[in-house]
């Protein structure tokens, strides 16, 4: 009842209300984005209506004149769903349904439906169900209005009150069960992070607005074959793959769910275990659709979510994707060294430079000469396996002189090995200097 999903092909009228001043539930994103969400959910938008108000109508959210207009549009289009690109109170939603004799769905409920449809893993399904239940708890009263009118005598409670309390208790118990299961999921993820820290494995996370091309970049870098479709929330469940970075070796690259303006808070809370992977990353790759009309607004939305999950202060590289869709020559505005760069997941443009930037931001130092004794063959092989060796020469005494480019952690581990010497450091002009680099 509370998780009713719109069937594929269901016809709907889309309503967006603009407000002249601040108002609860004001929708700041575009109508086109909400229509794209509807398309993703399989809903056919037959007509889009808009209204402008100073504040929401306390009963219907909109005025009665607009209410009659919507009713006529629903009848003319043979539609049985009103999709509202704003947030409604439980009472406003109930009153609209009673007045229009149709299902009314808010933007939040539409996003919850899409997430429920896309969740594939055990963890993802748990998180979506928890978000749905949290939302349902705020809407529960409207499901039992036909029983609320039944009154009890002195010392007795009406049937509606009893049924409502029973349903609230059932939802509350299920929420507690899901939260306990997700605590176990978070514990397992935490153990995985501890293992990676113990093994000194770096984590790089892709973040960004939904449909910015995160999964396409993930596939281009790792050949993982993750589903990458031109639609909102094509990726929901997080994916991890190893990515070789010169001088560091294998890092873990994670592909995460995309963000969107006014992402329901219940979803952010429910996906806490997943989003903690982002908050615990060593480096973020913030993917931006450079061809989008509202680039700055989308960047702000992503930054707001990152701040909410405690990841706003992490080192970040801005990746302006889909640069091939822009006029030739415009990519220069996005090229700001290791902090920002133009890329194209489709053509591969800029991905080689990206790997160098990742190495630099993760702390790869300037080239260092390492002297290995003849018997250190395993150490030599290990350095080659990490992709850290730039050049090699054999000394007269049989020792090996390797020009190595690696992070400080790897160099420290080398310096602690017997008979291994770290000599003066030269600079590779291909790698930008880092703060603290020796000349």
Predicted features along the sequence, with ranges:
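Conserved beta-strand segments of the P-loop GTPase G domain that flank and frequently precede/overlap
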Residues: 14-18, 48-51, 83-85, 286-289, ...
């Amino acid at each position: 009842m509370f998780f009713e999903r719109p069937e594929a092909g269901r016809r709907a009228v889309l309503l967006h209300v603009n407000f002249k001043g601040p108002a609860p539930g004001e929708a700041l994103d575009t109508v086109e984005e909400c229509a794209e969400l509807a398309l993703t959910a399989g809903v056919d938008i037959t007509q889009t209506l808009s209204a402008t108000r100073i504040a929401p109508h306390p009963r219907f959210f909109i005025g009665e004149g607009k209410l009659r207009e919507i009713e006529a549009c629903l009848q003319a289009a043979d539609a049985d769903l009103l999709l509202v690109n704003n947030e409604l109170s439980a009472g406003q939603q109930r009153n609209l349904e009673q007045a229009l004799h149709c299902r009314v769905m808010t933007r939040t409920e539409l996003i919850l439906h899409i997430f429920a449809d896309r969740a594939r893993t055990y963890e993802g399904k748990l998180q979506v169900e928890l978000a749905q239940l949290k939302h349902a708890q705020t809407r529960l009263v409207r499901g039992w209005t036909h029983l609320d009118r039944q009154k009890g005598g002195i010392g007795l409670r009406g049937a509606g009150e009893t049924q409502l309390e029973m349903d609230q208790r059932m939802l509350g118990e299920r929420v507690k069960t899901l939260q306990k299961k997700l605590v176990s999921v978070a514990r397992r993820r935490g153990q995985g992070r501890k293992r990676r820290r113990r093994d000194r494995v770096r984590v790089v996370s892709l973040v960004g607005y939904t449909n910015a091309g995160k999964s396409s970049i993930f596939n281009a870098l790792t050949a993982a074959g993750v589903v990458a479709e031109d639609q909102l929330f094509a990726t929901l469940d997080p994916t991890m793959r190893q990515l070789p970075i010169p001088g560091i070796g294998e890092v873990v690259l994670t592909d995460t769910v995309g963000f969107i303006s006014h992402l329901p808070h219940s979803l952010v809370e429910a996906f806490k275990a997943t989003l903690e992977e982002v908050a615990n990353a060593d480096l973020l790759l913030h993917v931006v659709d450079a061809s989008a009309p509202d680039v700055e607004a989308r960047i702000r939305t992503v930054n707001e979510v990152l701040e909410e999950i405690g990841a706003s202060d992490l080192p970040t590289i801005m990746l302006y994707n889909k640069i091939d869709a822009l006029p030739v020559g415009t990519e220069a505005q996005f090229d700001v060294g290791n902090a920002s760069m133009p890329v194209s997941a489709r053509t591969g443009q800029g991905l080689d430079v990206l790997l160098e930037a990742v190495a630099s931001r993760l702390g790869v130092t300037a080239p260092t000469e390492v002297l290995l004794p003849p018997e250190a063959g395993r150490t030599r092989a290990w350095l080659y396996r990490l992709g850290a060796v730039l050049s090699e020469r054999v000394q007269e005494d049989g020792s090996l002189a390797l020009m190595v480019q690696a992070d400080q952690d790897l160099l420290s581990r080398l310096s602690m090995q017997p008979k291994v010497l770290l000599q003066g450091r030269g600079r590779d002009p291909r790698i930008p200097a880092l703060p603290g680099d020796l000349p």
